Amino acid sequence: CEIEPAVVEAARVHLADVNRGVLDDPRTQVVLDDARHYLATTNETFDIITSDPIHPWVRGAAALYTAEYYDLVKARLRPGGVVTQWVPLYQTDAAAVKSQLATLFDAFPFATIWNSDPTNQGYDLVAMARALPMSFDMTRMQTHIEDLPTVRGSLGECDLGSALALLSTYAGDASSLSGWLADAERNVDVSLRLQYFAGLALDRYQDHAIYAAMRAAFSVPDGMFTGADHELDALYAALLR
């Protein structure tokens, strides 16, 4: 979904080399609508629902982080479907980040978080969740990456061109962060508290401190990662560095 038609045209004309011409792919269907409105009014279900709105202090964006929104997402996911959500750590504070994550984790108790900062100090995160526990087979993932040159190329541009590099961005899960989130206030439609939490901190850059607090609670659940012994040894060395 895209709410502004000019954005679609700009992406087609100016960003085709970056998005690999996805808008001209016959498999691509662009829906010109507010994404939440579309989910609320369609009967269609999806394998993946990804939400990458503008920062939650911008008016309206916090509605894509509410408990009601996540209930709607759950209703539109197919069995085994995955939801991803952007979580900024900059221009915000710990209260806002906690609100975002706790609200998501209430709806998806097996959610995981992944760090997008190559320095591993924290800048923003991607939360990934589904209805059931997740596990990641390193051997199978590496095979898929090698068999899909377009995917491999895209990941390589971000220095994530292997299963080891990709899975090394793992930053925690709902269970390990439960203590840190104990005082979190949930974001709901009636108040949109997240919008005001984030707005009060838009001139702050506490991303490294917030991420350090999250890392203090870091752990890897048993069975989350599988693969050959040498693959797992390399992964755990990267995760615990």
Give residue spans per PLM region:
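The AdoMet/dcAdoMet-binding core of the Class I SAM-like
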Residues: 1-101, 105-107, 113, 120-122
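Soluble small-group transferase modules, centered on the S-adenosyl donor enzyme superfamily
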Residues: 26, 34-36, 41, 113-241
